Amino acid sequence: MYLCTILGKNLLTSIIFITFAKNLNAMNRIFVFLTATILCAGMVVGCSPKSNKPRRAGTVIRDTIQGTPCCVYLPQNYEARVAKNQEVFPVLYLQHGMYGIEDDWTTQGRLVEIMDSLLHLGEVKEMVVIMPDNCPHRPTSDEERANAMSGEWESHFPEFMAESEAKYNISKDPSLRAIAGLSMGGFHTMHISHFLHGEFAYIGLFSPAIRPTSSHLVYDNWENEVRTLMATEPLYWIGIGKEDFLYDYVAEYRRWLEENHLEYTYYESAGGHTWDNWQDYICRFLKKLFR
């Protein structure tokens, strides 16, 4: 879960503790309040990065790339650094799930807070994070839901990536490129990565849908394409909750990977198809990038 969730839990516990103390006399209530306050202060300190470095704060801008609405996380002083010495940054393409929009990762996913906290701790590299609306037509029916995973977005991605590289100082080196997504975005990530095998050294599938139902060219011989992708030895990271409704599909895919002796990294959490888990997964995935 996101780094400081424990703080909220302990604050809530302390508030409940104080509420139960309402029947105590005045002196005891003061003692209980001071004890709870010290407890909470300790949790704040424990949750804060143990670092004397100045905190680095990225910024998020809205953009349109190849007609696709996007949110883009930029490292601190991005424009000045590019203008001064043409600094080039690693890039992560991060995709939302069905019914989501381009700002899901910044609003519900807490991407900015997670990135800034991990940067302050020195646990991640600075990078640009491009968060596209990978489902620009909001599905409202079963047919439209099927169209959201029809191959259209995956086949469009090379042009989207090319324009992203033209607009931002991001690396074209596959070793400095990552792609990830949750649920439908995990499905898109999986199939973009084999469609463009060799273009991404880091691939993250968070609670992903797996098997395509469309006959689009992107999905032709996808199992063979995954084998070809794995020959390039990417970090292939899969995360899923034990109660996730996609758990069995992911388990089946993992068995297939193992039967074919294809290496991957697997993380299994408690819980289901939730933002608590996806915050946890992105935090773990970010720490592995561009090492």
Predicted regions and their residues:
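Short intrinsically disordered, low-complexity coil segments enriched in acidic
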Residues: 1-7, 70-75
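Bacterial Sec-dependent N-terminal signal peptides
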Residues: 2, 6-7, 15-52
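Non-catalytic cap/lid and distal C-terminal segments of serine-dependent acyl enzymes
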Residues: 48-291
